[in-house]
């Protein structure tokens, strides 16, 4: 098993995902999603941004490395009666099985930023975005005062730099 996948499958991250739903909704409201757009939510968790995008009429695919989060997202979409959304387990570093230029919009809020190889993620995001499409990310920032940002800052001091 991919070590990053093993990490994200160790705990119940739906509680953290629930805490980010307001941020996910706010992002979706600001990025101009329209009916029929093809949208990829990368590091989708339990559907934090994917579900609001689907409610606007977009055709949404959510990808997350964690099988439990993919199951939770699928269940939330079913409970909401959304049929224009699907979720799949996958690695943001390569997006195997997703064709080139498949999406009008690729978005990730508090998801892709955790991938161990950020340059691979960036390449994959560009590859699956249509020419003229958009990539939108919501990430914690270096001077963010939140507890999570402080934990990440401390962890970074003891972590090797990402490989290119």
Show where each model-derived region lies.
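Conserved class I S-adenosyl-L-methionine
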Residues: 1-37, 48, 72, 152
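Class I SAM-dependent methyltransferase SAM/SAH-binding core
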Residues: 38-95, 120
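A short acidic, Gly/Pro-enriched loop at the edge of an enzyme's catalytic core
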Residues: 93-106
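A short SAM/SAH-binding and catalytic strip from SAM-dependent methyltransferases
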Residues: 104-119, 141
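Helix-to-beta-strand junctions that scaffold the AdoMet/dcAdoMet cofactor pocket
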Residues: 115-116, 129-131
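Conserved catalytic/acceptor-binding region of the Class I
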Residues: 119-120, 126, 134-164
């Amino acid at each position: 098993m991919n070590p990053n996948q093993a990490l994200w499958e160790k705990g119940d991250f739906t509680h953290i995902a629930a805490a980010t739903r307001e941020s996910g909704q706010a992002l979706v409201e600001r990025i101009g999603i329209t009916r029929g757009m093809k949208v990829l939510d990368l590091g989708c968790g339990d559907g934090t941004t994917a579900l609001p995008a689907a409610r606007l009429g977009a055709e949404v695919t959510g990808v997350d490395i964690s099988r439990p989060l993919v199951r939770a997202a699928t269940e939330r979409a079913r409970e909401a009666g959304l049929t224009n959304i699907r979720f799949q387990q996958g690695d943001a570093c390569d997006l195997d099985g997703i064709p080139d230029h498949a999406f009008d919009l690729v978005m990730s809020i508090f998801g892709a930023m955790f991938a161990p190889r950020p340059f691979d993620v960036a390449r994959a995001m560009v590859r699956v975005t249509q020419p003229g499409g958009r990539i939108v990310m919501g990430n914690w920032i270096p001077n963010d005062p939140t507890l999570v940002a402080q934990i990440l800052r401390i962890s970074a001091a003891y972590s090797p730099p990402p490989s290119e």
